[in-house]
Amino acid sequence: MVEVKFYDTVNDELLKFAVIISQSNGKWVFCKHKERDTYEVSGGHREAGEDILETAKRELQEETGAIKFEIKPICVYSVTGKTRVNDTGEETFGLLCFAEITEFAKELHSEMEKVVLMDELPENWTYPLIQPKLIENKENLKLY
């Protein structure tokens, strides 16, 4: 079982991931990985010595090809349970952000095959027990 929780803040050193919910012209932005037939929002691991908001910007640019965007932190989230990126099941923390993308690169240079703009949320999620809850929390907060 996977549990997702939300926090206003935690100690910075606990933040290991950044996940970015994105929209462009009123549509949801999702990535399709080259090795999967599912969709996900952009995100990834924090590099050593990296500011967590810089992690979010880097992952957004790498995975979506975003060139022009505005990004804002929403909250801290945690995931407890074994997942594709956590084989121990211990609670891990990340920064959840929102980005409005106004310009994309013509080509992607990452593990992502393509970026898709959707009116509705996808049915085939890469992380179905996590990412829908992150988006639901963003929508409930009505911040952006």
Each language-model region and where it sits:
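Acidic, metal-coordinating catalytic segment for phosphate/diphosphate chemistry
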Residues: 1-19
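Class I (Rossmann-like) S-adenosyl-L-methionine-dependent methyltransferase catalytic domain
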Residues: 5-10, 77-84, 91, 134, ...
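Short connector loops at helix/strand junctions that flank enzyme active sites
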Residues: 15-17, 23, 34-36, 41, ...
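Active-site beta-strand termini and strand-to-loop segments that position acidic
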Residues: 22-25, 99-101
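Conserved Nudix-box catalytic region and its N-terminal flanking loop in Nudix hydrolases
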Residues: 23-62
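Unchanged
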Residues: 46-70, 78-133
